[in-house]
Amino acid sequence: MRAEKQYTRNEVEETIVRWKKLKESGATEHDNTEYAQLCDVLRSAQSEIEARRDLKGHIKRCFSSVDKNTEKLILKQQVLAYKKLSQNLPAPDDCILSVLLRLSKDEQLLQSIVKQPLQNSKVDGKVRRDFGSCQITPSAKQQRKYLQYQISEDDAIKNRMFRRMSDLESYPAVMRDVAELKDDNERLNLDTIKRNALVELKKLRLIKQQESLRHQVMHCQPHLRTIVNAVERMSCRRPKLVPQATRLTEVLERQQRSDRERRLKQKQCDYLQTVCAHGREINVRTKNAQARAQKANRAVLAYHSHIEKEEQRRAERNAKQRLQALKENDEEAYLKLIDQAKDTRITHLLRQTDHYLDSLAAAVKVQQSQFGESAYDEDMDRRMNPEDDRKIDYYNVAHNIREVVTEQPSILVGGKLKEYQLRGLQWMISLYNNHLNGILADEMGLGKTIQTISLITHLIEKKRQNGPFLVIVPLSTLTNWTMEFERWAPSIVKIVYKGPPQVRKALHPQVRHSNFQVLLTTYEYIIKDRPLLSRIKWIYMIIDEGHRMKNTQSKLTNTLTTYYSSRYRLILTGTPLQNNLPELWALLNFVLPRIFNSIKSFDEWFNTPFANTGGQDKMELTEEESLLVIRRLHKVLRPFLLRRLKKDVEAELPDKVEKVIRCQMSGLQQKLYYQMKKHGMLYVEDAKRGKTGIKGLQNTVMQLKKICNHPFVFEDVERSIDPTGFNYDMLWRVSGKFELLDRILPKLFRSGHRILMFFQMTQIMNIMEDYLHYRQWRYLRLDGSTKADDRSKLLGVFNDPTAEVNLFLLSTRAGGLGLNLQTADTVIIFDSDWNPHQDLQAQDRAHRIGQTKEVRIYRLITEKSVEENILARAQYKLDIDGKVIQAGKFDNKSTPEEREAFLRSLLENENGEEENDEKGELDDDELNEILARGDDELRLFKQMTEDLERESPYGKNKEKERLIQVSELPEFYQREEPEKTTDLLQEEPLGRGARRRTPVVYDEAVRDAQWMAEMDMESEARPTRGRPKRNIASVDETPALTLNGKPKKKRGPAPDTLTSEHRSLLRRVCLEIYKAVNELEDDNGRPLNKLFLELPSKKLYPDYYMIIKSPIALDAIRKHINGTFYKTLEAMKSDLMTMFNNARTYNEEGSFVYEDANKMQTAMETKIEELEEDGTLATLRGMEAEATSQLEDRIENEA
């Protein structure tokens, strides 16, 4: 029978569609063959579907007829059979029969399904195929036959065994006689047969033993099965044979014992409960008594607390009244309140300061008496002031003779003095009349120079004092003083004492014969030409920028006080208190040496009034006590110091607005800053020497400041970033500050503002010049190397309204004093000075009397760098100046640990950041709002910003950012950690030929000496990047000079007189001793070498170098070890002992530095003993003796 064709769903649908069309067309099976075939196919498919439906229903009916109870019964029988079989026991017959019966029923059911007639042949074949592949289990009848067969088979085997045993037993016992009749082969076979039969018989007789053993094994096997044992635990349990009577006796005995124990325990518990109840009663009575006592105590405490609060409120009210009286400067009311309060501390403070004021009044009389009869008339003062008013008494002692000045001298022709300037002149005339000296401390820009000239003209015209007057000014302000004298007092005969030796020598005859009235000179010539200038008896000695006298041990101060003679002294300064109170005392001591003759007493009265109270801890002053000290100090200073502020005397002066602008670091600055901060040096990549480090970077803070300003200060870094030297965009892209200036300078120039830009480092000024040449912007420059004659030219050019120069580059120290640049209205502080008053002086070059525009100050600070800490320190110093004195903050007795902690705080990156409106990176809109001074400028700046973003190849969403990124740096800088270097680069004096690197000197004394030398020598021109300069303000730079004005001469290292073996052994021994001293730590792991590594700063510890005559530190000793300085071990040991003795001399006995020196000396001596024991020192001494002998022989031969 052929297989019928299989149809898909689509074919069936197409067939039905075709069948419908034929039927609609009227076709029948008789007249259309195609229609007949389609009808047959559809009938066949329909019959197949019905057959399948019938089969499924039949199977469902068959299986649903199974009884569920029967299934449960069969399951129980199967479980029972499993238990028996697991014990190797035969299953019960009823279990087997029930299973077989079930199987027979299933078989019949399946057969009935199979035999179900199928009408469709296709379905029938499919069902047969499906059921034919199944394996039908044997029927129950077959299984029963199989079991019967097995039993009959076992019986047959046993019967055969018994028959065989009977046959073997029936064999004759002796078969030798029969064997004798045979030949040898047959006899041998019979023996074998006999033996085999005997063995077989014995085997068969063991059947009983085998059955017994097999039964035992089958019996023990179930105990080895865990699952069976867990199910049939009871079947494995063996009954324990216990006599019933014995057990009953034991139970009764235990029961009696427990009853007896329970009665005893109950009795004990009852007794204890009685005792506890009694104790609780006692506790209750005690607590009640205590509660009554506590209630009474609380009532007493509440009463006393109420009284104490009332007293405290009264004391606070009185303290506020006293503080208010102090603030209102009502000393009489304050003293009455103090008498009521009976405050012993404040009374003691008043008594101390009053005593000091009395001593000052007496000293004033002594000061006045040196000119003859005292100007102070006690009887007149007593008649004028019948009341004992100490305030009036003290001031009247100083200014007893009063002269009213209403008009300026007639020979003062440069202009008309302002009202406050006339009052200043009157105050100075009062000092002159009362034979006293003073300090004119008006704020910078209020005309101290003009007031001083008015004093000289008044003395010449009114007092008939024709001089001589000595005016000592800084070199930077000498030109300005000369111009002011020519403008305001041209009739005065003056000598400007400056210039080279030949020029000054030409002025000597005029100076000797006193053919002048005023002599203008500088600090340097006061020292240098002391033999000539000190012979003259000066009427008045006037010192401009007198805060230079704050160091009483400086050479200038000692020279003036020791060799120069003058009747009157006047100090001019805009910052009388820059850092602390002793500096102010130094100024007072210079002008009034007989009054302020002891810094110790001044410090005791106003700094530590309670230092000697006997307590161990320092007693801090309260706000009231601090304010009282301030008022008393004002009382001390008022007769001798006059200070006015711009906001108080010049209401018409425009405002001065300062903005701090924080700049981001470029990628190069970030890498260099990280290297310097972590490793203490900068790593560069050199084509010849590979990875190297820049040598000579000792001052870490200074190097960090250089990195913040511009990385190209380090020449090797510039070569690695810009090898050709002609990528000028790198000048502003590598520095955050230069990038910011590249955005703001065009806007300021476009809007017509004139700018003063102040720098701390001339190296940065050199780079700025290169940048300005690149942008083709005209500028002027003034720094410490600018000649005095060029200064006046520069001022004239910049102040000329018709000049096209809108930018003036100045160094803070050289250009921040005595310059009038009122035509500028914008000041940019490129980097802040440690001394904030230097920056204030720089700002006041533009914010001065005569300024008509608002002055904007822009201070550039690198974000998250050491500059933020420097700015915070500067603000702290300004706070001191604002309060004049602050108890406990000006003692100048900071410990070395505190100074070290401060330096560490400068280097720590993770410090708390202050919330500030200008903090963080400024976008262009915020920057425009800061720069703009009106709506018109704001619109202009926005338009310029849009033009820059459109035209510049750098910026956001462009190929390169404005600041150089880390990804643009050479591969060497992109590493997280640079490789260790084996070579160090010494900074060379010159760059790549484009810019001369002039060493920057930060010490004022050295810089002054350098100025002196520069005036005696011609300087060389400073080349730049190759672009010619376009302005007349170019100043010359000189090479590095020594203090005597001669260029430094290079000298090679001295030849080593020791042999290589001797030098190697000496160096090894010295290094071992150095290592033992340098690596010493205390019990807490603190290194002891911390304060011995380098010499202390001369600025922080000036007294150290006065006390210690031979300063030395570990870094110098290590340098000597690596070189050829040490010829013997004793020389190195002597240096170490000198270092230890210096520490013990400068520090008090018992201090940690003193003890560290002792421990390090002990470590050195211990190491020397170890080297002595192992024979190393003996070998070294032998080499030293041999070297000494050879040296003596060589000397004798040369002789």
Swiss-Prot record:
It is an enzyme of class 3 (hydrolase). Residues 256-328 form the HSA domain. Residues 1061-1171 form the Bromo domain. Keywords: ATP-binding, Bromodomain, Chromatin regulator, Helicase, Hydrolase, Nucleotide-binding, Nucleus. GO terms for molecular function: ATP binding; ATP hydrolysis activity; chromatin binding; chromatin-protein adaptor activity; DNA binding; helicase activity; histone binding; histone octamer slider activity. Residues 740-903 form the Helicase C-terminal domain. One of its GO terms (cellular component) is nucleus. A motif (DEGH box) lies at residues 544-547. Residues 1017-1059 are annotated as: Disordered. Its main location: nucleus. Component of the RSC complex composed of at least arp9, arp42, rsc1, rsc4, rsc7, rsc9, rsc58, sfh1, snf21, ssr1, ssr2, ssr3 and ssr4. The complex interacts with histone and histone variant components of centromeric chromatin. Helicase. Component of the chromatin structure remodeling complex (RSC), which is involved in transcription regulation and nucleosome positioning. Controls particularly membrane and organelle development genes. This is Chromatin structure-remodeling complex subunit snf21.
